[in-house]
Every structure is written in structure tokens, then in C-alpha cells.
């Protein structure tokens, strides 16, 4: 499989895209291109007003970023509180379901014991409950 790709350069990226990360030989041709486009870096002479305006812009941007970070921190803290509250609610809901399950099992056991003691068969009790259910359904629909 390696012989299939050995002959061509089709799998390699073009040089414009690889220049983003620098050339493979270790030279810094990207910096040369930038410095030649802007002129020599030692010849750049910024005036005090230009430096002051750049500094003020930097301070404004840092302040804005600081405010955004504070807002994100506040939001993340509120999200954490909401998640903790939701977890507590879910735990309480699980406990409620467990308690309800225990009560239903106990009620069903008591009903089965009552049916056994009364001498009436299970089929008869099921017919009675079915008739009561049909009666409730009929009243609910009309």
C-alpha cells in the first residue's frame, strides 16, 4: 500500500497551507515574508501618542474580557446551583417512588389476604373490580 503513494505528492498539502505551521526545514520564511511586507522591524518607530492609543485600546479590551469572564463565571456558578438542586429533586423523587412501591406491594398483599379469608374466589374479585372500572369509565365518558 505504501508503494501506491510513494510516487506522487497528491496526498501532501500545498505549501500555502503548510506555511501556517512553518516550513519543515526549520527556517523562518513566514517571518521573513511578514517583515518584508511591513518593512524592517528595526525601522519602525512608534510615536508616544500611537503607543498610548494602543495601550488604551489594550486596556479597554482587557476590561471587556474581564467583564465577560466574570459573567461566564457567574453563569457557571448559577448552573452548578441549578444542577445540584435538580439532583436533590431527583433523589427525593426516587425515594418517593420507592415508598410508593412499598405501599402498593403491602396493599396488594393485604387485598390478597382479604380475598383468601372471605372465601370468594380471585376470579369473582376480578369481575367485581372490572365492573367497577367499567362503571367509572362509563361515568367519565358521559
Swiss-Prot record:
CDD domains assigned: SNARE_Bet1
BP-aspect Gene Ontology terms: endoplasmic reticulum to Golgi vesicle-mediated transport; intracellular protein transport; retrograde vesicle-mediated transport, Golgi to endoplasmic reticulum; vesicle fusion; vesicle fusion with Golgi apparatus
Protein location: Golgi apparatus membrane; Endoplasmic reticulum membrane
SMART domains: t_SNARE
Gene3D superfamilies membership: 1.20.5.110
Record's subunit section: Component of a SNARE complex consisting of SED5, BOS1, BET1 and SEC22 or YKT6. Interacts with SEC24.
Similarity comment: family membership: Belongs to the BET1 family.
The name this protein goes by in its record: Protein transport protein BET1
Lineage: Eukaryota, Fungi, Dikarya, Ascomycota, Saccharomycotina
Gene: BET1
